[in-house]
Amino acid sequence: MGQFISFMQEIPIFLQEALNIALVAVSLICIVKGLVNLYRCGLFQLMVFLVLAGRSCSEETFKIGMHTQFQEVSLSLSALLTNQSHELPMLCLANKTHLYLKSGRSSFKINIDSVTVLTRSADVFVHSPKLGSCFESDEEWVVAWWIEAIGHRWDQDPGLLCRNKTKTEGKLIQINISRADGNVHYGWRLKNGLDHIYRGREEPCFEGEQCLIKIQPEDWPTDCKADHTNTFRFLSRSQKSIAVGRTLKAFFSWSLTDPLGNEAPGGYCLEKWMLVASELKCFGNTAIAKCNQNHDSEFCDMLRLFDYNKNAIKTLNEETKTRVNVLSHTINALISDNLLMKNKIRELMSVPYCNYTRFWYVNHTLSGQHSLPRCWMIRNNSYLNSSEFRNEWILESDFLISEMLSKEYSERQGRTPITLVDICFWSTVFFTSTLFLHLIGFPTHEHIRGEGCPLPHRLNSMGGCRCGKYLPLKKPTIWHRRH
């Protein structure tokens, strides 16, 4: 699995090679052609016929020639119930007795019992949807909306009691829905409203007893999930109030932001910096690496000489000129004694020698690669003509080209993954195998000789349907390859 993941990650890289592109093309052609051969040989059709034919005699099992499909779609409106300040309310019924309401960042718990908490003498009496003295502004509208949804009419029904929001006991509103005396019709109407928006709730109050609804802020329980069907029931109960006092906001709005959440209407800008290289010819790490491997070269001695002198001058910049000269002479003595002696003997014998001044190398103009510089020999105080050491620089050029080809071959081998070669090999084997299957061919179904295909039914030896839908015709059957 790891090899496959690595192979997929390297696709943009190895497609830069022509050989890799050819391998990919051959693999794709073999795979596609192999699948076509498998389809044309009839093997798939025969397997489908043997597995499915005769399972059912219904006319609806297979529809030959029909291009319609039975499909379904499921809608989830939970995305609309987002955590915005003006969202559609969510309702929840937990354990059939605990009622909850949530809208925006405010959530409430609705309790129904017979315990009186608020009194008219000590608390606020309200008879309008303006609940500013009881709740905050972002809570006031949703509580008033919920009260109207269960059937309360502000201009006709009794007033409500609520605790002043400045008190430390907490926010609370109390509604009397007792079905007794003159309150019976009002109580039944609000009970029916609760039953409509909270389907399946259990009624804790009995006929003739005191029954109070208490609404107070509380955290939304974790076991309550967003259910848009309850929201639809809530909206259907308060259709008139929605049209007048509510506007749905920001359901399908979007904006571009950066990773920190700041608005970025213009999107992102991509800046690309480029480095400009000079035309200076440099002998880079390749030449240094060769010098580290092979020390018997005048050019490498000069590199070491320059390096030592540079470091000495940098370190002893404030030293006297005499100390610098002494140190320079000492460092220059590090040049290979063997080469110095050899060049001196050559000079005495009038044999070409090196004076560490002029060097030659073979440069490849297309790739910019070059050989390791070699000393240009001197004889009789004059440099040799290039034709005098023609064999040397021709041989050096051969070495350079061989080195370049070897390096290029190694790089190409490295850029051709083994997985790609395996895919190409096995796809070719797959194509060859399916080619033989296509030449052989398989029968795809059975039907009565000389008559049409009775798909999807499977026939017996008497020419009848095995499931009993059609009577035996006592006609011979034959296997056919195509319809």
UniProtKB/Swiss-Prot annotation:
<feature type="disulfide bond">
    <location>
        <begin position="291"/>
        <end position="300"/>
    </location>
</feature>
<comment type="similarity">
    <text>Belongs to the arenaviridae GPC protein family.</text>
</comment>
<feature type="disulfide bond">
    <location>
        <begin position="354"/>
        <end position="375"/>
    </location>
</feature>
<keyword id="KW-1168">Fusion of virus membrane with host membrane</keyword>
<feature type="binding site">
    <location>
        <position position="467"/>
    </location>
    <ligand>
        <name>Zn(2+) 1</name>
    </ligand>
</feature>
<feature type="glycosylation site" description="N-linked (GlcNAc...) asparagine; by host">
    <location>
        <position position="176"/>
    </location>
</feature>
<feature type="glycosylation site" description="N-linked (GlcNAc...) asparagine; by host">
    <location>
        <position position="355"/>
    </location>
</feature>
<keyword id="KW-0261">Viral envelope protein</keyword>
<feature type="glycosylation site" description="N-linked (GlcNAc...) asparagine; by host">
    <location>
        <position position="363"/>
    </location>
</feature>
<keyword id="KW-1162">Viral penetration into host cytoplasm</keyword>
<feature type="site" description="Cleavage; by host MBTPS1">
    <location>
        <begin position="249"/>
        <end position="250"/>
    </location>
</feature>
<feature type="glycosylation site" description="N-linked (GlcNAc...) asparagine; by host">
    <location>
        <position position="164"/>
    </location>
</feature>
<feature type="transmembrane region" description="Helical">
    <location>
        <begin position="18"/>
        <end position="32"/>
    </location>
</feature>
<feature type="disulfide bond">
    <location>
        <begin position="269"/>
        <end position="282"/>
    </location>
</feature>
<keyword id="KW-1160">Virus entry into host cell</keyword>
<feature type="disulfide bond">
    <location>
        <begin position="92"/>
        <end position="224"/>
    </location>
</feature>
<dbReference type="GO" id="GO:0044167">
    <property type="term" value="C:host cell endoplasmic reticulum membrane"/>
</dbReference>
<feature type="transmembrane region" description="Helical">
    <location>
        <begin position="423"/>
        <end position="443"/>
    </location>
</feature>
<feature type="lipid moiety-binding region" description="N-myristoyl glycine; by host">
    <location>
        <position position="2"/>
    </location>
</feature>
<feature type="glycosylation site" description="N-linked (GlcNAc...) asparagine; by host">
    <location>
        <position position="83"/>
    </location>
</feature>
<dbReference type="GO" id="GO:0020002">
    <property type="term" value="C:host cell plasma membrane"/>
</dbReference>
<keyword id="KW-0812">Transmembrane</keyword>
<feature type="binding site">
    <location>
        <position position="445"/>
    </location>
    <ligand>
        <name>Zn(2+) 2</name>
    </ligand>
</feature>
<dbReference type="InterPro" id="IPR001535">
    <property type="entry name" value="Arena_glycoprot"/>
</dbReference>
<dbReference type="InterPro" id="IPR043015">
    <property type="entry name" value="Arena_glycoprot_zinc-bd"/>
</dbReference>
<protein>
    <recommendedName>
        <fullName>Pre-glycoprotein polyprotein GP complex</fullName>
    </recommendedName>
</protein>
<keyword id="KW-0449">Lipoprotein</keyword>
<dbReference type="GO" id="GO:0016020">
    <property type="term" value="C:membrane"/>
</dbReference>
<keyword id="KW-1032">Host cell membrane</keyword>
<feature type="glycosylation site" description="N-linked (GlcNAc...) asparagine; by host">
    <location>
        <position position="385"/>
    </location>
</feature>
<feature type="glycosylation site" description="N-linked (GlcNAc...) asparagine; by host">
    <location>
        <position position="95"/>
    </location>
</feature>
<keyword id="KW-0325">Glycoprotein</keyword>
<keyword id="KW-1040">Host Golgi apparatus</keyword>
<feature type="binding site">
    <location>
        <position position="453"/>
    </location>
    <ligand>
        <name>Zn(2+) 2</name>
    </ligand>
</feature>
<dbReference type="Pfam" id="PF00798">
    <property type="entry name" value="Arena_glycoprot"/>
</dbReference>
<feature type="site" description="Cleavage; by host signal peptidase">
    <location>
        <begin position="58"/>
        <end position="59"/>
    </location>
</feature>
<feature type="transmembrane region" description="Helical">
    <location>
        <begin position="34"/>
        <end position="53"/>
    </location>
</feature>
<feature type="binding site">
    <location>
        <position position="447"/>
    </location>
    <ligand>
        <name>Zn(2+) 2</name>
    </ligand>
</feature>
<feature type="topological domain" description="Extracellular">
    <location>
        <begin position="2"/>
        <end position="17"/>
    </location>
</feature>
<feature type="binding site">
    <location>
        <position position="465"/>
    </location>
    <ligand>
        <name>Zn(2+) 1</name>
    </ligand>
</feature>
<feature type="site" description="Important for GP-C-mediated membrane fusion">
    <location>
        <position position="33"/>
    </location>
</feature>
<feature type="binding site">
    <location>
        <position position="457"/>
    </location>
    <ligand>
        <name>Zn(2+) 1</name>
    </ligand>
</feature>
